[in-house]
Each structure stands twice: as C-alpha cells, then as structure tokens.
C-alpha cells in the first residue's frame, strides 16, 4: 500500500519518500540540497495521494492502430493546494508537479516563538495573509506544511478552510514529519481531515520542536538562520 493507516494519521511508505526524508534530515545537507529534497518529496507525496486517495475511471481511447480501453484519474481538475507560508513553498512546488492544474491558496501563518508554548502544548498563531480560491464540493483540498509539530498552526489554518461556505469532497493535511501531539490536536480540531505524513516522529521537545525531526524547515530551505 502506498499510504498506510497509523492510528489517527496515514504514512507515505514509498521507498523514495523515505530516502528523500533521510537526506533532508541530515544536518550536513546544505540549503540548496535541502530545498530540492523538499521539492522531490512533495512530488512523490503528490503521486502517492493520486494512487491512494483518488479514483480512476475506464475510458475508450483511439490508438494509431485500433480502439482500446484506458484508465484515467478522476478529479485532477478539482484539486486545491494550500501553501502554508513559508516553509511549505518548496514542498508545494513538488506537489504541483503531480497536480499541474491545481488551484492554489496561500495562508501566511506562524507561531509566536517569543510567547512560547502554553501548558496545553499550544502556541499563539499569527495569521498575516489569507488568499484562497473558491472551494467546491467536488474538490480535493491539500493543505501542505512540511512540519506538523504542536498542530497549533494547522488547526488555525483548518479554521479558515472550513469556514468556507462549501465543504470539499476530500480534506487532506500533508506533512513531511509529524509529532504525535500535533496529530492528536488536528484530529480533535477537524475530525474529517485526512492527515498524511512521510514520518511520525517520537515527540516534541520543551520548545515545541519535533524530535528527531529535521530542524526548522523554513530556515533550512531559505537559509535564514
């Protein structure tokens, strides 16, 4: 199975996804290689979503020699990808290789590191910009963020998505690495969300970072440390 259920989340099991994740986890991986790795990982995840979450239909096709039956993926015109700025940008770039006709939304949301994590394991979230396309009942909405840590940011983003007038056919949360705490928080905030991650790591540290994780994905992708 390309995507396996693990409790409240699902894991992308493709060998190339695990290979790319291992490469970008490495502290020695430099900025360009890290960013390109996130792009490749997004592309692999996109193909696995197509294989594991989208339906196909048979259709007649005329070849140069005869008529035969072929198979097409349904719903490729009805995909919305939401980029959670900024870390998701290279991840989304890869997803767009798999979904070139997807409509795109952008939400600039980040946690307040100075305020710190409260006793419930949550961060206050600052949302500075939201631009979403119209969402229809036929859509598959993919919210992409490489790191699902405390789940505070994703729960806030989901509030914006679900406040739209129309409920999409499928609502997917896609991450490269997730913490158990974040999965629980997102599942409680939006039970209908289908959480998909390449890896589910051990825990969060006292600062709310995923362990073993891969560091700050945004800083590593954009070399802002």
Curated annotation (Swiss-Prot):
Residues the entry annotates as binding 5-phospho-alpha-D-ribose 1-diphosphate: 86, 111, 145-153, 216
Residues bound to GTP: 36-40
GO MF annotation terms: GTP binding; magnesium ion binding; uracil phosphoribosyltransferase activity
Keyword Lyase: no
Pathway this chain belongs to: Pyrimidine metabolism; UMP biosynthesis via salvage pathway; UMP from uracil: step 1/1
CDD domains: PRTases_typeI
Gene Ontology annotations of biological process type: UMP salvage; uracil salvage
Activation/inhibition comment: Allosterically activated by GTP.
Cofactor: Mg(2+)
Pfam families: UPRTase (PF14681)
UniProt binding sites for uracil: 210, 215-217
Function: Catalyzes the conversion of uracil and 5-phospho-alpha-D-ribose 1-diphosphate (PRPP) to UMP and diphosphate.
Recorded family membership: Belongs to the UPRTase family.
Protein's recorded name: Uracil phosphoribosyltransferase
């Amino acid at each position: 199975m390309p995507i396996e259920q693990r409790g409240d989340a699902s894991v992308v099991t493709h060998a190339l996804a695990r290979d790319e994740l291992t490469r970008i986890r490495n502290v020695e991986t430099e900025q360009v290689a890290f960013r390109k790795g996130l792009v490749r990982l997004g592309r692999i995840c996109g193909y696995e979503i197509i294989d594991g979450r989208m339906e196909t239909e048979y259709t007649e096709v005329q070849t140069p020699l005869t008529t035969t039956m072929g198979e097409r993926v349904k719903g490729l015109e009805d995909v919305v990808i939401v980029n959670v700025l900024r870390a998701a940008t290279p991840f989304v770039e890869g997803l767009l290789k798999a979904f070139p006709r997807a409509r795109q939304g952008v939400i600039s949301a980040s946690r307040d590191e100075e305020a710190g994590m409260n006793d419930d394991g949550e961060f206050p979230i600052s949302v500075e910009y939201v631009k979403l396309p119209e969402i229809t009942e036929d859509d598959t909405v993919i919210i992409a963020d490489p790191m699902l840590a405390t789940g505070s940011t994703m729960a806030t983003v989901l509030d914006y998505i679900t406040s739209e007038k129309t409920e999409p056919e499928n609502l997917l949360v896609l991450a490269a690495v997730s913490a158990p705490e974040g999965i629980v928080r997102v599942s409680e905030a939006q039970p209908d969300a289908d959480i998909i991650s390449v890896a589910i790591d051990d825990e969060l540290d006292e600062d709310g970072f995923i362990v073993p994780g891969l560091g700050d994905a945004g800083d590593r992708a954009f070399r802002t440390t």
